[in-house]
Amino acid sequence: MGGLEFCDQTSWYQIFIAFSLTYTPIAIYSLKVFRGTLAGIVNIFIFINCCVSFVYLMYHHSVTNTIALSLGAVIALVWGIYTLVKIVDWLVIRCRLCFLGRSYILAPPSHVDTSDGRQSLTTSLTTAFVVRKPGSTLVNGQLVPDFQRLVLGGKKAVSKGAVNLLKYVSK
């Protein structure tokens, strides 16, 4: 019985590169779908794939021209800077949530505190619109049963605006 050619000792990196080149575009597209911590993990995964692919091209293909190598270096550098900015933003928001209290450590960065718990908001990290009417409160178009507090980007929001339509901004 013959052995499998793709399982020999010298081709494990080729399998990794094949998966990397196949699944990195899928992971890049999934950044549109995911948000929060999962998007950060996918972003780090893409950065690692870009770096590994670039190192593979440099190390194993010495005949690669300088244009391809410089393009790979630019892509890895730009994605690395983007990943670093996203990690710093995530850490800043987590630190802000830690300053709000122990119960906020794992909370989403923008959420509404209600009597039922926390309700996540899909909004920008700086503004939210709250419409208060007798019997109901809408936050960015979402019905909130018992509005207690609004947190935007890890900061407690303060109200600015008219009586019924309130624009909340982070302190």
Curated annotation (Swiss-Prot):
Membrane-topology annotation of the record: Multi-pass membrane protein
Keyword Cell membrane listed: no
Primary location class: virion
Cleavable signal peptide: none
One Gene Ontology cellular component: virion membrane
Keywords linked to the UniProt accession: Membrane, Transmembrane, Transmembrane helix, Viral envelope protein, Virion
Coiled coil: none
Keyword hit for Repeat: no
Any Pfam family the entry gives: Arteri_Gl
Compartment(s) where it occurs, according to its Swiss-Prot or TrEMBL record: Virion membrane
InterPro entries: Arteri_GP5 (IPR001332)
Superkingdom in the source lineage: Viruses
Transmembrane segments: 11-31, 38-58, 73-93
Protein name: Protein X
Species, as recorded: Lactate dehydrogenase-elevating virus
Origin organism lineage: Viruses, Riboviria, Orthornavirae, Pisuviricota, Pisoniviricetes
Gene name per UniProt: VPX
